């Protein structure tokens, strides 16, 4: 019997850090992209075999998520990509490591799964050596997306414009919580 998944929600938290001191923090509910909800839940729960296009493999950050005043734009839940992607990091099979397009390992992530509570937490840290502009000046971000290998975006969040340079780290905590109407069942 197949279960339809509903109530997939969660929490998004972004921090700009300098020497572990929080310079900026912003939190909001998760924004799960509608067409990928069931695929995401089944992937997290291990109900479908591992395939590159069914597991988290990519994160993109961009600057197209804010209004002129710096406030975040509204999300519809039907987005398919960032409005203006600036950097992209890809998981290439090694646990806890993401790579940029130059093959550099500059971003780390931590997965935490608590299936009894229906939680999946992903923490991504973009350190002070990456995510900056090529000229080592401020780079502004206001949107982030998580993607499967086939480029289906499954989570998207806009946030107030944040400026990152080589003295700061960007920390993103993304928590997904999911339930089925009859508990967890095999498809």
Where are these regions (language model features)?
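Small cysteine-rich, disulfide-bonded extracellular modules of the LU/uPAR three-finger superfamily
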Residues: 1-141, 149-187
